[in-house]
Amino acid sequence: MINYSSCSYLLKLCRTLKHLHQFHAQFITSGRISNDFKQNSVFANVLFAITSISPSASASKEVVSYATSVFRFITNPSTFCFNTIIRICTLHEPSSLSSKRFFVEMRRRSVPPDFHTFPFVFKACAAKKNGDLTLVKTLHCQALRFGLLSDLFTLNTLIRVYSLIAPIDSALQLFDENPQRDVVTYNVLIDGLVKAREIVRARELFDSMPLRDLVSWNSLISGYAQMNHCREAIKLFDEMVALGLKPDNVAIVSTLSACAQSGDWQKGKAIHDYTKRKRLFIDSFLATGLVDFYAKCGFIDTAMEIFELCSDKTLFTWNAMITGLAMHGNGELTVDYFRKMVSSGIKPDGVTFISVLVGCSHSGLVDEARNLFDQMRSLYDVNREMKHYGCMADLLGRAGLIEEAAEMIEQMPKDGGNREKLLAWSGLLGGCRIHGNIEIAEKAANRVKALSPEDGGVYKVMVEMYANAERWEEVVKVREIIDRDKKVKKNVGFSKVLS
């Protein structure tokens, strides 16, 4: 039998929604608590217990629905209760309007917000697609009115939100206006600057920090690597080690990525040796980075050895290995590792299929690619994207199946990006050149010209094909077009997409 004194202890043991339902049912049927204050207290504790449920542990809508029903049992909910329900909605349904509706209700009831109120409402505004900047600015004004921006957690959250959904200068202005900062404040803004590709300003802010932590170093090293500033990433990593700091796996993987991009395999191997000397634990994240590095630098056997030693392979680890095999033209091994991945219980994603299709293309495994492409939706529940159609079109074109390749491109999603369509039609044009299919080459050339009018390489290919077929009248017509169009004439020996 549940009594008031045992409620808090029992709620701490609840880790799933089912446990909370059982507690709730026992609490109601016991009928032992008639005091409204105690009843409100129990429901407030139930509400707080819901925050410990992982968003992945239960269906998000079910969690929010249950939390809302519990909240409605509370008479005159306090600031704590409103903060808790707002937090639950933000954690489980960040893109919904629930968090904001509860905040509006809170203000309508004249319940005063505190330091815990605004951060989760800010996050809910940022989680919505494209963000709700107008509402964020309104909430910003309210936080100022209540004097809550003096709280660093609130300030740091707002800086992060501005960096996500507004021009980065908004976050910088807020940073400059508030002299009260901690290392998290700097880290949040550095991360925002990196995401905005303002790497120079990120470095300036990093250099001005009175105190740095691992996150500070990781953010900048990762930013350099992402923007292909490989030397700067490697140099910063070396500086970090020279200062006696112990880099974690995030810094190591980012630097390995920079080594792979720059082809500096010796430095990458030295970093791998460093992990061995320091006896760092090679988790799936670091193993993925090492596999990716060695595969990109041409050491596919070493990549395979590291892959096999990894005991906790994730989707990303498998993708790194499969992509590496595809890059090296090992089509049969690519398919073999794909089968092993599926057998191990890992569900493939779109990246997996792009790599497998590329591997099949390099090895001429047409039937295997067809089967995998057909199974993407039916067997693996993976949506086909523009790149998948492009890979199939390239594979079919290489194999001389020009008509089928053209049909594949025609099936590409109508709302897809022009770049992917351009690459697909250009690849088909290249296949037509190899196999001498002028009829489809003309169709492909027209599509390429429509998507990239200044690409002179198209005309060069058509002149070559017409000349090989001794269709001299068409050769003359194409040359006349080249002579008339100055832009085409300028780029006739150059193509962005044709080899």
UniProtKB/Swiss-Prot annotation:
Region listing for Type E motif, in residue ranges: 424-499
InterPro entries (UniProt xref): E_motif, Pentatricopeptide_rpt, PPR_At4g14850-like_plant, TPR-like_helical_dom_sf
Taxonomy, superkingdom: Eukaryota
GO term, biological process aspect, one: RNA modification
SUPFAM superfamilies associated with the record: TPR-like
GO molecular function list: RNA binding
PPR repeat extents: 78-113, 114-150, 151-181, 182-212, 213-247, 248-282, 283-313, 314-348, 349-379, 385-419
Keywords for the protein's UniProt record, in alphabetical order: Repeat
Similarity remark: Belongs to the PPR family. PCMP-E subfamily.
This protein's name: Pentatricopeptide repeat-containing protein At5g61800
